[in-house]
From Swiss-Prot:
InterPro entries: LS, LS/RS, LS/RS_sf. Disulfide bonds: none annotated. Pathway: Cofactor biosynthesis; riboflavin biosynthesis; riboflavin from 2-hydroxy-3-oxobutyl phosphate and 5-amino-6-(D-ribitylamino)uracil: step 1/2. The gene is ribH. This is 6,7-dimethyl-8-ribityllumazine synthase. It comes from Haemophilus influenzae (strain ATCC 51907 / DSM 11121 / KW20 / Rd). GO terms for cellular component: cytoplasm; cytosol; riboflavin synthase complex. Its EC number is 2.5.1.78. NCBIfam families: lumazine-synth, PRK00061.1-4. It catalyses: (2S)-2-hydroxy-3-oxobutyl phosphate + 5-amino-6-(D-ribitylamino)uracil = 6,7-dimethyl-8-(1-D-ribityl)lumazine + phosphate + 2 H2O + H(+). (2S)-2-hydroxy-3-oxobutyl phosphate binds at G86, T87, R128. Pfam families: DMRL_synthase.
Amino acid sequence: MKVLEGSVAAPNAKVAVVIARFNSFINESLLEGAIDALKRIGQVKDENITIVRTPGAYELPLVARRLAESKKFDAIVALGTVIRGGTAHFEYVAGEASSGLGKVAMDAEIPVAFGVLTTENIEQAIERAGTKAGNKGAEAALTALEMVNLIQQIDAA
């Protein structure tokens, strides 16, 4: 029986981290977690990490698509924060970011890790950006690396 399972060490992986500027005080913590995980755990070289900033989470899918189409990256990590407010805006932005990033992954056949927080309030966002609920940016980065390795194994099998 053959079992394929990716590891998180990917020293030669080229990774784009796409980060929304809106809610930057949260997103910068996600970015710090992602970069730390890529370098320290994934052993990705500094020169193989590209950071791209978008205005907000809604713009993440288009930028991720362009990066995927460039064929310069093995994986993309998308980071952002969408916090529910008093209008339907939350549903539109969160839904489009989620479905758009998923579409990029499927269409381009490249791992696109979803590190976009979709929370009810600021407290939940802070908890998920490096306090008691961990750092979802770091988790997304490690997911991206594991998927890079898993896809390589599938292609070689």
